[in-house]
């Protein structure tokens, strides 16, 4: 799919959080199996961004070229960092923190541009969030970043304000996809109105009750597919880009196979009702 910024974004992304020493191997495997979008963050607490870069470099040495890939990383505010391992000067002004984090990401990922830079979470105040966004806009102006996004944004009012106030509007929203937020129905509606790509994480982990539901099981049985494949297929048919962080090559293959089948209209309605998408 193509974003409002004109950037091609794969319909399924490989997420690299919490992979630690296995990061490089798993990124190599994901790209070898056919993933073309990688999500990471400049946040040593949960991501090994340099090992993501090593895995990408290996793939680029086996026939892929940089334009074949969609590399998305995040600026993580100080509140989300391990204070003993912050990838920028925590005493620096916020715009400088963002600039330092961006430069670290370029080094880690061994690239000279990012396809998307995501603000990992809103800042404590709207003023700070807009200040961070303007610093990120300057990186787009300098052609180091192709588009911008925001993560962990569950407030439709905040997202709407950002869309109005930003000079470069968000192209991506990435949120946890779970029942506690009503599956982000309000946020997703705003994303549709503003032509923002909605990305979901914790899509499987947070939803065992969906995966175990008879509506999903019946579709999986009819199609000869797994419950995760059915849920992912429903989401891509409904303008959601899921992240998968599987460590299993077999599951990587299953995830990529969601493009090989379609749900029936009755199955879409039944699963949609579970997520509140249909009455």
Which positions does each model-derived feature cover?
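Active-site groove signature of glycoside hydrolases
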Residues: 106-126
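Short, acidic/polar
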Residues: 19-31, 91-109, 156-160, 183
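Beta/alpha (TIM)-barrel catalytic core signal, keyed to glycine-rich beta->alpha loops juxtaposed to Asp/Glu
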Residues: 121-279
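N-terminal binding-site loop/beta-alpha segment at the start of enzyme catalytic domains
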Residues: 1-69, 73, 131, 206
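A structural motif
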Residues: 35, 111-114, 145, 170
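Structural motif corresponding to the early beta-alpha repeats
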Residues: 66-95, 120
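Short, well-ordered amphipathic alpha-helices
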Residues: 50-60, 102-106, 136, 159-163
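Active-site mouth loops of central-metabolism enzymes
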Residues: 10-22, 83-96, 126
């Amino acid at each position: 799919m193509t974003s409002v910024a004109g950037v091609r974004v794969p319909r399924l992304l490989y997420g690299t959080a919490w992979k630690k020493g296995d990061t490089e191997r798993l990124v190599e495997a994901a790209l070898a199996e056919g993933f073309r979008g990688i999500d990471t963050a400049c946040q040593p607490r949960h991501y090994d961004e340099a090992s993501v870069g090593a895995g990408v470099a290996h793939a680029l040495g086996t026939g892929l070229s940089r334009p074949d890939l969609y590399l998305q990383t995040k600026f993580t505010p100080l509140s989300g960092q391990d204070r003993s391992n912050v990838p920028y000067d925590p005493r620096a002004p916020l715009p400088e923190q963002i600039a330092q984090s961006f430069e670290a990401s370029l080094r880690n990922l061994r690239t000279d541009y990012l396809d998307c830079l995501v603000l990992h979470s809103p800042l404590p105040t709207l003023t700070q969030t807009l200040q961070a966004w303007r610093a990120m806009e300057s990186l787009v102006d300098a052609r180091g970043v192709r588009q911008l996004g925001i993560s962990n944004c569950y407030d439709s009012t905040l997202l709407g304000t950002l869309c109005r106030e930003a000079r470069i509007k968000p192209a991506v929203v990435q949120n946890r996809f779970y029942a506690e937020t009503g599956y982000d129905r309000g946020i997703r509606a705003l994303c549709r109105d503003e032509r923002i790509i909605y990305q979901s994480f914790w899509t499987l982990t947070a939803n065992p009750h969906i995966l175990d539901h008879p509506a999903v099981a019946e579709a999986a049985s009819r199609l000869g597919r797994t419950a995760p494949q059915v849920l992912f297929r429903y989401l891509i048919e409904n303008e959601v880009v899921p992240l998968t962080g599987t460590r299993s090559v077999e599951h990587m293959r299953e995830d990529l196979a969601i493009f090989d089948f379609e749900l029936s209209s009755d199955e879409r309605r039944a699963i949609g009702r579970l997520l509140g998408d249909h009455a």
